[in-house]
Structures are given as structure tokens and as C-alpha cells.
Amino acid sequence: MKIANNTVVTEFILLGLTQSQDIQLLVFVLILIFYLIILPGNFLIIFTIRSDPGLTAPLYLFLGNLAFLDASYSFIVAPRMLVDFLSEKKVISYRGCITQLFFLHFLGGGEGLLLVVMAFDRYIAICRPLHCSTVMNPRACYAMMLALWLGGFVHSIIQVVLILRLPFCGPNQLDNFFCDVRQVIKLACTDMFVVELLMVFNSGLMTLLCFLGLLASYAVILCHVRRAASEGKNKAMSTCTTRVIIILLMFGPAIFIYMCPFRALPADKMVSLFHTVIFPLMNPMIYTLRNQEVKTSMKRLLSRHVVCQVDFIIRN
């Protein structure tokens, strides 16, 4: 595509993770494996929670939504990345870039807020158990779910508005494997200081505050659990520990990316790869499958499926 001073950029060229064919092949295989685990794993969690009438506590509503967000989030980047590995020229249209950027921040922002809601749920369940049924009633839970989806939308639309107002008339090469605000704004034909500052406040500072708030809330819960002498102490400790792991895995890369928008770092691509492809696998592998009730329900569901298949084969 020829680019002159008066030419409007209509597409971006993605430079990808690496130019090495051997490394690209290795990464392609690894990402394909991750993706084939992420989608079935998260949808199995959703189906298990939806089909078991015993999993009605607020925790399972939140886990089901977390699985849906993870599956959707991985769908935004991974499939196109796999196709690009097989293409000589990795091109994404301007509209496609904006669309990808919107859904990344919509789903990512919603997931961050969901983790805050889940921390509040654990605080009520562990530190204020007598108030659990009144505070975390179905109406309140659905209101919080609506609020976090709206919060993710507002966060994302701010990013999109920032991009749509920028003129692009020069270079069109993105040094990454997907579209994100940090790389796109560097290609605009105007001074980016104010935009990058707004980006720090909208993404970086919000991510950092959520991260610190989550760590503080789980620190309070862990202190409360350690002082308690109850049969469920070990289970509560284990639950909180896994959630702290999820928080570190999700917010660590996000803080690294969005708190330093003014300069490119050598580790940017690997951090982005972890955040967009590998992290969504953490929900089924670390989070939900540590829940005994979900595992038991999943085993019953799979057993019924096997029995139905065997019965069908015998009858035919």
C-alpha cells in the first residue's frame, strides 16, 4: 500500500511475534494446543454450571461468567493469530483493528471488574457469613453482573473514541500480533503525549487500583481465616490462594503493558502473548477445577454422557 502525506491509512500490517520460521511453527503448535483446551474447557464449565440445579450459589454464577469471558477473550486474538502464522502478509483492516481493540478492552475490563465482584463475594461469604443471603441475593448478584458488563463497555468505548479521533497518514506497521491501543496510537500523525496520558489513567491506573484493591481484600480474608478455628479453614485458604494467583496472572501483565505506554520494551510481545492467549487457560486449569462441587458435577455430567452414548450404540 502506498502511503503519502495526504493518504489515509485503511489497513495495518502486523509484524507478528517473530520473523523466524522455526519459532513461528513452534508457537503456532503451542497456541493451537492452548486454544483447543481453552474453548472446550470453558464451555464445559458453563454447561456444567447451567445444567446442575445444585450449583445456584453466587459463586457459580460468577464462575460461569468468568468462563464465558475467558472463552470470548481468547476468540478475539488466537484464531486470527493462527491464520496469520500461515500467511505471508499479515494485514488487518482499520475497521477490523478497531473492532478487535474494542472487544479486547470490553471483555478484559469486564473480567477485571468481575474479579473485584468475586472478591467481594468471598469477603461476605467468609467474613460476614450471616449476611451472605441478604447481601448476595439473586437481585444484587444480577445487578453487579450488569454493572461489570457496563463498566467494561464504558472502559472500552473510551479507548475506541481516543483512536477514532486520531489521524493516520504515515507508517502502518504494528510491531505486534494484534491491535491494541499502545501500538496503534504510535502510528498517528499527531503528538501523542496527551492521548498516552489518558491511556495511563483509563487503563493503567484503573488496572493498578483494581489490582491493589483485590490484593488488600484477599489479605483481609486470609487474616480472618487464619484466626478462625473451623472445619472449612483449609478450603477457604485454598480458595483465596488460587484467586490471588489468578489476580497476579491477569493484572501483572496488564499493569506492565498499560502503565508504560511511552516506550517499547523487549518483553512486550511475550507479555501480550501471555495475557491474550495463555491467561484464559488459567480459569479452567487453576480456578474452577479446584472447586470440588464443580468437579463432582462435571464428573456426573460426563458419566451421563458416556452412558447415553453406550446406550445409543447398543440400541443401534
UniProtKB/Swiss-Prot annotation:
Residues with attached carbohydrate: N5
Protein's UniProt keywords contain Chaperone: no
Membrane topology: Multi-pass membrane protein
Family annotation (PANTHER family): OLFACTORY RECEPTOR
InterPro entries: GPCR_Rhodpsn (IPR000276), GPCR_Rhodpsn_7TM (IPR017452), Olfact_rcpt (IPR000725), Olfactory_Receptors (IPR050427)
A GO cellular component annotation in the UniProt record: plasma membrane
Keyword Oxidoreductase assigned: no
Single GO MF annotation: G protein-coupled receptor activity
Stated family: Belongs to the G-protein coupled receptor 1 family.
Protein name in the entry: Olfactory receptor 4N4
Extracellular side: 1-25, 80-100, 159-195, 259-269
Compartments, record wording: Cell membrane
Transmembrane segments: 26-49, 58-79, 101-120, 140-158, 196-219, 236-258, 270-289
UniProt keyword annotations, A-Z: Cell membrane, Disulfide bond, G-protein coupled receptor, Glycoprotein, Membrane, Olfaction, Receptor, Sensory transduction, Transducer, Transmembrane, Transmembrane helix
Main location: membrane
Cytoplasmic topological domain: 50-57, 121-139, 220-235, 290-316
One Pfam family per UniProt: 7tm_4
